[in-house]
Swiss-Prot record:
HAMAP family documented for this protein: dCTP_deaminase
Gene: dcd
InterPro entries: dCTP_deaminase, dUTPase-like_sf, dUTPase_trimeric
Protein name, per record: dCTP deaminase
Lineage of origin: Bacteria, Pseudomonadati, Pseudomonadota, Gammaproteobacteria, Moraxellales
Keyword Nucleotide-binding attributed: yes
Family of the protein in this entry: Belongs to the dCTP deaminase family.
Length: 191
């Protein structure tokens, strides 16, 4: 497998709809000239934006967190340009971008250092071959203070790895009917 460059990312987004909406360059300032956490195409990746919908974890019901039987009441829904994550807690969000991953590509998501250096960690499982949807993002606030994340700005970087022609996967995410196929919005755990 080889990592793919900005030229390949641009071609796949513009000609095959791999990333929608797609930004061909790096955006570092908003229309008013204010600094942003950058997003868009980089040399060997694509920096995704966080949408305006968030689910912030709360322990109001003193429930046990169980991935097989997850209680939706464990979250407070927030819609806005920013989200405050309580200390030692987490929030879910989604990308602005909708992805359509080709059959011969595996995509890995890494958090942006701007957030990591503030103790905010982004976790996303790999985007498997032929998966499509909005990416659900998990933000962990590892600090003892409230932490802020911004909608419409860069939060993580996607890296695209393409397999050799003779090593394309036998069964894709779509082939096996993956439970998160085509997800839109912030998606909670499914079993």
């Amino acid at each position: 497998m080889s990592i793919k460059s900005d030229r390949w990312i641009r071609k796949m987004a513009e000609e095959h709809g791999m990333i929608e909406p797609y930004e061909p360059g790096q955006v570092r300032f908003n229309e008013a000239g204010d600094k942003l956490v950058s997003y868009g195409t980089s040399s060997y990746g694509y920096d995704v934006r966080c949408a305006r919908e968030f689910k912030v974890f709360t322990n109001v019901h003193s429930a046990i967190v169980d991935p097989k039987n997850f209680d939706e009441n464990s979250f407070i829904d927030i819609v806005g340009d920013e989200c405050i994550i309580p200390p030692n807690s987490f929030a879910l969000a989604r990308t602005v971008e909708y992805f359509r991953i080709p059959r011969d590509v595996l995509t890995i998501c890494l958090g942006k250092s701007t957030y990591a250096r503030c103790g905010i960690i982004v976790n996303v499982t790999p985007l498997e071959p032929e998966w499509e949807g909005h990416v659900t993002l998990e933000f962990s606030n590892t600090t003892t203070l409230p932490a802020r994340i911004y909608a419409g700005e860069g939060v993580a970087q996607m890296l695209f790895f393409q397999s050799d022609a003779d090593d394309i996967c036998e069964t894709s995410y779509k082939d096996r009917g993956g439970k998160y196929q085509g997800q839109r919005g912030v998606t909670l755990p499914r079993t």
